[in-house]
Amino acid sequence: SPRLISGEKLLEKVLKAVPSDGWDPVMVPGTPSAWAEAVKKFGNLSLSEVLEPAAKYAEEGYPLAPNIGKQWVLGYKRFMKAGGPEKFEGWFETFAPDGKMLSDGDVFRCQAMADTLREIGATNAESFYRGELAKKIAAYSEKTGGWMRLDDLEDYRAEFVEPITTNYHG
């Protein structure tokens, strides 16, 4: 988790529970690093090749499925209630451009998502933790009251761990 946050600091904010949105529950994102490590350990393709189909869908668009549309509507309502576009600017720019929710069958496109996936692939996730993407994440966190800083991202490394196991039914 970011160095600037601790259980004590959350308690100082008089939180009875960690909220489900905003910066307080955010930890250093591990997924891009995990992708890179998994591809290195188990893959036959580069991370760039693995991510390209997703980047292409983000760039060219795809029709919004009904179940995804329902989740976006729920998110829209929740984020409006919790502070709206002022607090969740990135979410609204991505999923409700111009304040308009997409409907079932509408084509969703997101060039920024495509560009980000390609940058992650091209740098084997390094940009996300120690490059331009990391700088953008850290700057946005600081600007909007988040706890995450560049050194939190720079220090992150995904690791393979032995999973916890138990004997079930003998």
Question: What does each model-identified segment do?
Answer:
Residues 1-124, 128-130, 134-169:
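Noncatalytic scaffold domains of N-terminal-nucleophile
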